[in-house]
Amino acid sequence: AELNTIGEKIFKNEAGGIKKDLVYWNKGENFPSLGIGHFIWYKQGEPGIFEESFPQLVEFLKSKNVKLPKIMAENKYSPWKDRQELINLKTKKNPDIEELTNFLYDNKDLQIMFIFKRLEASLEKMMAVSSNKENVRKQFYRVASSPNGLYPLIDYVNFKGEGTNPKERYKEQGWGLLQVLENMKGAETGKATLTEFSNSAKFVLQRRVNNSDPSKNERKWLQGWFNRCNTYAE
């Protein structure tokens, strides 16, 4: 039950809780974002520094023997050439897009299971690359064992990734879950833990924006990102 509650929160964070925004393409990005976790899906040959997660979701759903909608079943890569094409198809209520949207809306529980599995796998990946393994493990379990502590971990790993991909760096500094945990120092559990996690996430995201190429104007996202981090301490 806790996972389903978390799933609804992530749906709200990523897609504003709006069904049609389960199939989305952000302005200025070279990929669409799909599902409750706004999973990234690249076109064939599209270079991307952000971790792609939609193909893994498709594989996970296949392993559960779920009947996939046409777009997911027939395309290894994102089938739309650009944002405008996807917007046009959505506006025309294209049946394949409608089918995809309905599927993603009706199968929120499977998507949250997928995100949870990603979280479980992430600790090993983070410890493999961290220079301070013990602190990472300690902080991970410190957050996980706090009341409502699974939500921040699951949401953040879905929101900004594990932080283990060397390509996901600006000026050699990452912004994933690993960097948030590495930046934490405390030992007490409970509310204080979640407040520290929330503040650490904001610190890492502020640093990302400071290190980013100003022409990308990432600053425009920051307030929304901070609002999301505030939900971790609630």
Regions found by a protein language model. Name each.
Residues 1-234:
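Cell-wall polysaccharide-cleaving catalytic domain and substrate-binding groove, primarily
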